[in-house]
Amino acid sequence: MARSGRYKVKFRRRREGKTDYMKRLALLKSRKPRVVVRRTNRYIIVQFIGFKGEGDEVIAYAFSKELEKYGWPYGGKNLPAAYLTGYLAAMRAKKAGVTEAILDIGRFPSTKGSRLYAALKGVLDAGIDVPHSPEILPDEDRIRGEHIASFAEKLEEEGSLERQFSDYLRRGADPKIISEAFESVLERISAMSNG
């Protein structure tokens, strides 16, 4: 690999594709806490991170698996779960004194209306100021899960609802009423965070 004196080995996290150091430096120059949104194959993670000389400090944290404690039976990777996770993390960050932040989506592609921006919408609706473009946020109908409910109704007419939503149905969650469940979980998060 490094056979001559002119070859420079990149940082390990850059080689692994985990960190874009130029983007990280630009975010740190803002001197604001970062809203770090990460998605896995099953969950959404939202963290408020502050910079310290010896390393980053986690100010507040929310993981979409925590939504089960608030009565959310619909899994942790869909758009409504991303919104609720962002909202929960922002409520915790407000308790810690955060009023503004800057978004860090890492090396994920910036796609309009994605789960990453649904989490950002949850942070914004909780009252934390984050610079953003309003066009990038998903529609209110998608945030409440109405696209999932309409798709479930269409599949029920075709007779293939059990095949597509087997995980929800196994947990006793009806995908056609996801919007009502979203509203009740949002109220519970607001009540527990304010109370």
From Swiss-Prot:
SUPFAM superfamilies linked to this entry: Translational machinery components
Sorted UniProt keywords: Ribonucleoprotein, Ribosomal protein, RNA-binding, rRNA-binding
Record Gene3D superfamilies: 3.30.420.100
GO molecular function ontology, one term from the record: 5S rRNA binding
InterPro entries: Rbsml_uL18_euk
Family matches, as CDD domains: Ribosomal_L18_L5e
Pfam families, sorted: Ribosomal_L5e
GO CC aspect terms: cytosolic large ribosomal subunit
Biological process per Gene Ontology, one example term: translation
Subunit structure: Part of the 50S ribosomal subunit. Contacts the 5S and 23S rRNAs.
HAMAP family named in the record: Ribosomal_uL18_A
Family: Belongs to the universal ribosomal protein uL18 family.
PANTHER family per record: LARGE RIBOSOMAL SUBUNIT PROTEIN UL18 (PTHR23410:SF12), RIBOSOMAL PROTEIN L5-RELATED (PTHR23410)
Known role: This is one of the proteins that bind and probably mediate the attachment of the 5S RNA into the large ribosomal subunit, where it forms part of the central protuberance.
Descriptive protein name: Large ribosomal subunit protein uL18
Gene symbol of the encoding locus: rpl18
